[in-house]
Amino acid sequence: SVGVHCVDCARQSQAGRRQARTLLGGNVTSGALVTKILVGLCVVVYALQVLIPEVTMQSLELRLGFVPALAVYEPWRFLTTAFLHANYMHLGFNMWALWVLGGALEPVLGRWRFTCVYLLSALGGSTMIYWLSWPETDSWLTLTVGASGAVFGLFSAMFIVQRRFGRDTSGIVALVAINAVISFLGANISWQGHLGGLVVGGIVSAIYAWAPRGKRQAVGIAGTIAVAVALVGLDLLRALLS
């Protein structure tokens, strides 16, 4: 007998298939694409800072780095600062951590959730710096750069995910503790940005991790919007108080 392939039937069958999802509701995808894009962007920006004389490190940092005194006038700095780095070691550590954490988290959370955790953690880091800086002090004019706030948000997300699945969290707790000590004791390290990223990353990832199974997408979207609005509101309030 000869079989006849019905094109329309095949299309309907494919359309009716449900997208495979991870345990936390993210779409199953191959590879950590967002992680690779974020690492690539940071590396390219740093290469521009170093290799092209016209795009000097100081020029990019002054235009895109976070400075509390300029935040209300140039709000893009809250996020663009996360794509700049001060030196090779700064870039190397952050990109290594992003590569390792992103490679583990992105497949579990899904691309859009992972992206939101990363960007909101970066915003949270800048917001914490903003609130803990004062016009009467040098901190108000201090330039801050780096993806560390976002990376600390990923540390927090890793802790949340491991707790959600009942896994041992002692390793990630020890790693965060070591980095926290370095943040507080090291020179020219913004512990405020690290703390802000850690807190926001934990909140956002907890929303994703413990959202009711039947309402994961709705709760995830609502929670993401709520956190973003809260951070913007805090930034606006700080601007009014300064």
Residue ranges of each PLM-predicted region?
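Membrane-interface helix-boundary signature
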Residues: 28-35, 76, 89, 168, ...
